[in-house]
Amino acid sequence: MNLKVILTPINLKGEEEPNCVERITIMPCILIDTEICLNVRCRSPFAKFKVLIIVDGFDSAYIQATFCSISDSVTIVNKSNEKHVTFDGFVRPDDEGTTMPYVIGPLYSVDAAVADRKVKDVVDSIQNQQTMLKVFINEANVYNKWNMLKGLIYNNNNESVLVK
C-alpha cells in the first residue's frame, strides 16, 4: 500500500503555485499501528500548503480511509473496481456535496501569557507547533444485494447449500 502526500504551495495572493509542488510517497512496511510524521519547512511564516493525500496500491477490494484533524473528520471508501482513495479536504458545512481544501501553514497565534518572553522564545514556540492529521486505513466490509444473496445460498467453499 502506498500513501502519497502532495503539497501545493499557496502564495500570499491566495494562488496555487503548481510548479513548486512537493510529492512524498510513503510505503509503510508494517501496516499495523504505523505512525508517520512529516516536518515541512516553509520559506515564509505566511506560506500555506494545500494538502492532497492518495492511498493506492492495496490488495483489498474495498478500503476505508478515515482522515481526522483537531476539528473535523471524514471517512472515504473506494468505489468498486477503483484502486485508490483521494483526500482533498473536509466536507463543507453548508454544502455536503463539496469539500473545502485542506490547507496547512506555519502561522500560529501565541497566548497572551507569553507576552513577557523573549522574541526568540515566542518564535520557537510558534515554529514547534504542529498541524496534526491522522489517517486510519482499514479493509472495508461492503455488502450489496448480490453478496447478501450469495451468502444465503453458498457456504464459504462456494458450494450451494440448497443442493445437498
Swiss-Prot record:
A Gene Ontology CC term for this entry?
Answer: host cell cytoplasm
Q: Which InterPro entries match?
A: AcMNPV_Da18
Q: Which domain of life is it from?
A: Viruses
The intrachain disulfides are none
What UniProt keywords apply to this chain's record, in alphabetical order?
Answer: Early protein, Host cytoplasm
Record's subcellular location: Host cytoplasm
Chief location of this protein within or outside the cell: host cell
* Summary of the function given for this chain in its UniProt record: This protein is required for viral late gene expression.
Protein name (Swiss-Prot/TrEMBL):
Early 18.5 kDa protein
Q: Which organism is it from?
A: Autographa californica nuclear polyhedrosis virus (AcMNPV)
